[in-house]
């Protein structure tokens, strides 16, 4: 019995040993499989140390300074990016989405170039009924369709109203606030909340509100520049997109006269980014190959003046005056106009200050031509008001890049007069035949919709043509 128990004990001990070894191997295999799966599932693309050392901008003094991230703070930077940047995605997914954007741009370019040589007007006749006012209506139509199909804008969410995500929707700078509002209301199909699907990135600060809330009388633009510089530093720290292109696929939008000055807060914003501005003065750094002219549209209570609204009586209004102007004497051009024509000719009433008993818009509706001289700045709502009143705009300006010149032929609905020719202004206008005048006026009626702000926006209106101008800059394509 003792001998049998001894054999059984040895057999049991050996069995336990083999069983333990098998169990350990099984657990090891399962654990390895689990961790392999875990690493595959949670594999992230962290920023390289060299990437974190890229230059960023700060502006504690209101000017641009370059700061290099110290290696001791690399870990902290990674943690910050991981915890605050919702745009961090797995590396393959990032690459695929960015590739899709670039592939979309390439396909759009090819499609537009193919359409540019197409002379078949039936394709776009219903949307662009008057082909004469466009540089290349076929290319414009195809480009617009490609924009509707592909174009996506990412709006940075950093910042608080009213300086960011808000803007004026009334008065002379209304177009600035209306654009910001349309992008922020989430009504437009062009906004995306996935930055990796975006074609461009919008910096939604309002220069008009910066001037209103930060500017102090008899000072300078330093507080505005400081804010803009700090804002760009914030978004470039929270997201990788600004540093990826030095801001080339980013845009700001403003109608305030200080827009160009404020954009100097950051070198890349001024030189590389798309600046959408009413004050499009080429002598002040406006570059039409990358920047966009924003039409200056004055709104009263959110609408244009009732006398400028489209109506049958507007088109039938008699036009007893050859030309008209009323405005203050400032800037280099207006003094020349007033010197030669102020109260000189009854056919061309020119006032420095319009008498109170007379109505400005009544004069516009009663004149064949409306003089649009630049003031301190090149832009003026007078150009758009002339279009609304069907009064042929006479552009008297130096270095002013007119709105939507990439698609519109301004010579088909306005008269461009060199400043040196102002003394001959009446002679020039009198030389325009009645047939040509009626042609110009007819074209004004067709082009009007491109300068209207609608609520909600309508196809081919000012909001959408502004987006289209940005789209063209992203395509790096010129429609001719």
Curated annotation (Swiss-Prot):
Q: When the coding gene is removed by deletion, what phenotypic consequences does the entry describe? A: No visible phenotype.
Which GO MF term does the entry hold, naming one? glycosyltransferase activity
Per the UniProt entry, what species is this protein from, by scientific name? Arabidopsis thaliana
Broad enzyme group = transferase
> Which positions, given as ranges, span the membrane?
11-31
Keywords associated with the record: Cell wall biogenesis/degradation, Glycoprotein, Glycosyltransferase, Golgi apparatus, Membrane, Signal-anchor, Transferase, Transmembrane, Transmembrane helix
Instruction: Quote the EC number.
Output: 2.4.-.-
Membrane-related topology note: Single-pass type II membrane protein
Q: Name one GO cellular component term.
A: Golgi membrane
What is the name attached to this protein's record?
Probable glycosyltransferase At5g25310
Q: Which regions of this chain are Cytoplasmic-facing, per the record's topological domains?
A: 1-10
Does RNA-binding show up as a keyword for this record?
Answer: no
* Glycosites: 85, 120, 243, 271, 281
User: A GO biological process this protein is involved in?
Assistant: cell wall organization
Q: What does this protein do?
A: May be involved in cell wall biosynthesis.
Family of the protein in this entry? Belongs to the glycosyltransferase 47 family.
Subcellular location field? Golgi apparatus membrane
């Amino acid at each position: 019995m003792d001998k049998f128990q001894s054999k059984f004990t040895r057999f049991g001990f050996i069995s336990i040993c083999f069983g333990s070894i098998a169990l350990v191997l099984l657990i090891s295999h399962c654990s390895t499989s689990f961790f392999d799966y875990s690493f595959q599932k949670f594999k992230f693309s962290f920023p390289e140390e060299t990437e974190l050392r890229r230059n960023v901008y700060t502006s504690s003094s209101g000017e641009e300074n370059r700061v290099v991230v110290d290696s001791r703070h690399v870990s902290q930077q990674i943690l910050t990016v991981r915890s605050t940047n919702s745009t961090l995605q797995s590396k393959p997914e990032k690459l695929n989405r960015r590739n899709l954007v670039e592939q979309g741009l390439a396909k759009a370019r090819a499609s537009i170039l193919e359409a540019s040589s197409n002379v078949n007007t039936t394709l776009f006749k219903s949307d662009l009924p008057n082909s004469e006012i466009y540089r290349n209506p076929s290319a414009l139509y195809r480009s617009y369709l490609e924009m509707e199909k592909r174009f996506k804008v990412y709006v940075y969410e950093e910042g608080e109203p009213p300086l960011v995500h808000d803007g004026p929707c009334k008065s002379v700078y209304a177009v600035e606030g209306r654009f910001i509002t349309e992008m922020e209301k989430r009504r437009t199909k062009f906004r995306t909340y996935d930055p990796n699907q975006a074609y461009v990135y919008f910096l939604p600060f309002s220069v008009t509100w910066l001037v209103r809330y930060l500017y102090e009388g008899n000072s300078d633009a330093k507080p505005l520049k400081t804010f803009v510089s700090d804002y760009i530093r914030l978004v470039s720290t929270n997201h990788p997109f600004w540093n990826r292109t030095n801001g080339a696929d980013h845009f700001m939008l403003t109608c305030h006269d200080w827009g160009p000055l404020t954009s100097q807060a950051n070198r890349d914003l001024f030189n590389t980014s798309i600046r959408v501005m009413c004050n499009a003065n080429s002598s002040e750094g406006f570059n039409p190959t990358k920047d966009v002219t924003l039409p200056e549209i004055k709104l009263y209570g959110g609408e244009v003046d009732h006398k400028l609204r489209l109506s049958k009586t507007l088109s039938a209004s008699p036009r007893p005056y050859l030309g008209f102007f009323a405005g203050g004497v400032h800037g280099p051009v207006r003094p020349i106009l007033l010197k030669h024509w102020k109260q000189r000719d009854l056919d061309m009433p020119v006032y420095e200050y319009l008498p109170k008993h007379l109505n400005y818009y009544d004069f516009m509706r009663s004149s064949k031509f409306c003089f649009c001289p630049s003031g301190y700045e090149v832009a003026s709502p007078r150009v758009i008001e002339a279009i609304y009143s069907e009064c042929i705009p006479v552009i008297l300006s130096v270095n002013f890049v007119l709105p939507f010149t990439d698609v519109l032929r301004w010579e088909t609905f306005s008269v461009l007069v060199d400043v040196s020719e102002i003394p001959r202004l009446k002679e020039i206008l009198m030389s325009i035949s009645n047939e040509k005048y009626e042609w110009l006026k007819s074209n004004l009626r067709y082009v009007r919709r491109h300068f209207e702000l609608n609520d909600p926006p309508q196809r081919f209106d000012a909001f959408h043509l502004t987006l289209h101008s940005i789209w063209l800059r992203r395509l790096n394509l010129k429609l001719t």
